């Protein structure tokens, strides 16, 4: 699969462990691709839920996906600062159709004031039983929550204000071409 280039638009598809489609984002603009990572932006992007409901993202958001980490990061740029929504998820896979990953329910939300919350623990436990997550998978996911929290606490990558500013500026430049 040929990597998308800066300024290209891609579709993102989130699946559940049982293979069912969970959510789709249309027209995410690619800002950078490397061998292991894709950085993009959603801005008034159409999102379709598995039940057919549709909505549009409200604010620009820098999205970060990696082939080695079991999480992805959404930095939502708001008037009062940046908030984050982090999905504990499989490393991404890219094919001709979309960037794809498996969503494993656990989420970390960081508010503009820095407060952090681990979300959907009950949903994770329920799906772990229902979809038979292996002990190895459970271990990997929990270890990557620790890695994610370390990134947050140390302002690494997308959790750096400079990172968000650089990629938002690049998005504005590409959008206004």
Swiss-Prot record:
Belongs to the Ntdp family. Its EC number is 3.6.1.15, 3.6.1.6. Mg(2+) 1 binds at residues 87, 103, 107. The active site is at 23 (proton donor). Its cofactor is Mg(2+). The keyword Hydrolase applies. It comes from the Bacteria. Keywords: Hydrolase, Magnesium, Metal-binding. Has nucleoside phosphatase activity towards nucleoside triphosphates and nucleoside diphosphates. It catalyses: a ribonucleoside 5'-triphosphate + H2O = a ribonucleoside 5'-diphosphate + phosphate + H(+); a ribonucleoside 5'-diphosphate + H2O = a ribonucleoside 5'-phosphate + phosphate + H(+). This is Nucleoside triphosphate/diphosphate phosphatase. Mg(2+) 2 binds at residues 105, 107, 120, 123. The keyword Nucleotidyltransferase does not apply. Pfam families: DUF402. GO terms for molecular function: magnesium ion binding; nucleoside diphosphate phosphatase activity; ribonucleoside triphosphate phosphatase activity. It comes from Streptococcus pneumoniae (strain ATCC 700669 / Spain 23F-1).
